[in-house]
A protein has these predicted regions:
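Walker A/P-loop phosphate-binding motif and the immediately C-terminal alpha-helix
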Residues: 38-76, 193
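Phosphate-binding P-loop
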Residues: 31-37
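Conserved catalytic-core segment of NTP-binding enzymes
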Residues: 142, 149-207
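Residue-level signature of catalytic and energy-coupling elements of molecular machines
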Residues: 36, 47, 73, 81, ...
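Switch II (G3) loop of P-loop NTPases
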Residues: 90-95, 114-130, 135-165
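Amphipathic alpha-helical transducer elements in NTP-driven molecular machines
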Residues: 33, 78, 129-137, 160, ...
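Cysteine-cluster motifs in flexible loop/terminal segments that predominantly coordinate metals
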Residues: 1-29
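Phosphate-binding loop that captures ATP/GTP phosphates
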Residues: 68-69, 74-118, 133
Length: 207
């Protein structure tokens, strides 16, 4: 912190030590046995634009390059990643320390999703925002992520509790924004872009 700090962050640059410390103070640590090198968020302002498909395709691509790849499905109430990889419900094992072991696809991609915890993949998840945000944190720090090179986080549409939780609690290296050319969609996606900018999360690309 500068000796001339006025404690008014509105007048402070993004490189300020005080502001940087504030941004990292909410990060949730991984368990010691876990290791994740890069975290890439996949977001969209509006649903139905192919966000989960893009997430799956990027994970498969990085996996084909020899990288150990994982997907954290943060779309708790509308998860589709397990189905995309042919995984069934109740596919998550537990360690002796009560840590979740992610399911592994036929390609070797580690996946953690709410649908993998349900008895039936059509059962609804009827939770309020804080509970959903808590589940996302658990998927991050109560799951055994072993030697992951790239983790893709499939987030729900919008700028609500889950994107905020991911941006604050996970060490996100950047995001991919998925959109479609309609004017209405573009307006909503602009909100996601501004949210990322306000939280100093790099935008890596637009699909």
């Amino acid at each position: 912190m500068s000796e001339n700090c006025t404690h008014n962050c509105n007048t402070c640059g993004e490189s300020c030590g005080s502001r940087t410390a504030e941004q990292t103070s909410f990060l949730e640590p991984l368990i010691p046995a876990s290791s994740v090198k890069k975290v890439i968020g996949v977001v969209s302002g509006k649903g139905g634009v192919g966000k989960s498909l893009v997430t799956a395709m990027m994970a498969v691509k990085m996996n084909s390059k020899g990288k150990h790849t994982a997907i954290l499905d943060a779309d708790i109430t509308g998860p589709s990643i397990p189905k995309a990889f042919g995984l069934n419900d109740n596919n998550v094992m537990m360690t002796n320390d009560n840590l979740m072991i992610p399911a592994t696809s036929a390609l070797g991609i580690d996946i953690m999703s709410a649908n993998l915890l349900l008895d039936n993949d059509t059962d609804p998840v009827i939770w309020r925002g804080p509970v959903i945000a808590g589940a996302v944190k658990q998927f991050w720090n109560e799951t055994l992520w072993e030697d992951v090179d790239y983790m893709f986080v499939d987030m729900p549409p919008g700028t609500g509790d889950v994107p905020l939780t991911v941006f604050q609690s996970l060490p996100v290296n950047g995001i991919i924004i998925v959109t479609s050319p309609q004017e209405l969609v573009s307006m909503i996606v602009a909100k996601a872009v501004k949210m990322a900018q306000k939280m100093n999360v790099p935008i890596l690309g637009l699909v």
